[in-house]
Amino acid sequence: AASDVYKRQGVVAFELSTGDIHIFESRAVTFATGGFGRIFKVSSNAHSLTGDGPGILYQKGIPLEDMEFYQFHPTGIYRLGILLSEAARGEGGILRNKDGERFMERYAPSIKDLAPRDMVSRAIATEISQGNGAGPDSDYVYLDLTHLGAETIKKKLPDITDFVRTYVKIEPINEPIPVQPTA
C-alpha cells in the first residue's frame, strides 16, 4: 500500500546541545530509561529515579520486560533508605525477628545470615508478612551486633556505628539495629 512507503522504525532524537534532530532506523529499539527505585516506599535511590520512562512506555502499550528483577538490599536502616554494609553480617551480625529469634536458620540453614541479598530480603519480607516484624507497625527486623563486642564493632564496623548513632540514635554495641529491605 502507498502508506507503507512512508513507514519507518527506529528513534527520532533531539540533540540538546545543538538543537539538531537525528533519525536512527532500526528493526528493534531498547529503552534504557534509568532507575525507578523511588516507586518503593523505602529506597536508597536518587529522588529523580521515579520510573517516568517505564511509566510512559507502559501507558503507550509498549511491553516492559523483567520488571520483577529489582534488587533489594536486605539491611537498610528502617525508614531511611540508608544501606548498612553487608560487612555487618560478614563479621557475624545476626538478623532477629520481634521475638529475638535468629530466623535465617529457617530460610538458609547452612549459610544463615550470610545468604545472598535476594534470599535475605525475601526472608525478611516473609517474617514481616507473617507478623514477626518488630516495632509498632511490625514492619522491620533487627540486625544484632551486640554479641560481637565493643572492640570488634568499633574496629571493623565504624561506618555502621556512625550511621546508626547519627540517624537512629541507637548504640549498636548495646542495642540491635532496626532494618528492612531497601530498594
Question: What are the residue ranges of the model-derived segments?
Answer:
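Short, small-residue-biased leader/transition segments that mark boundaries at the very start
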Residues: 1-6
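An anion/pyrophosphate-binding glycine-rich loop and adjacent beta-alpha core
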Residues: 56, 62-179
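Core beta-strand elements of the Rossmann-like FAD/NAD(P) dinucleotide-binding domain
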Residues: 19-28
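Glycine-/small-residue-rich beta->alpha transition segments that form the dinucleotide
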Residues: 28, 32-37
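Glycine-rich nucleotide phosphate-binding loop and flanking beta-alpha elements
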Residues: 19, 36-38, 71
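A generic structural motif
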Residues: 14-16, 96
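A conserved FAD-binding loop/helix module that cradles the flavin
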Residues: 39-56, 60
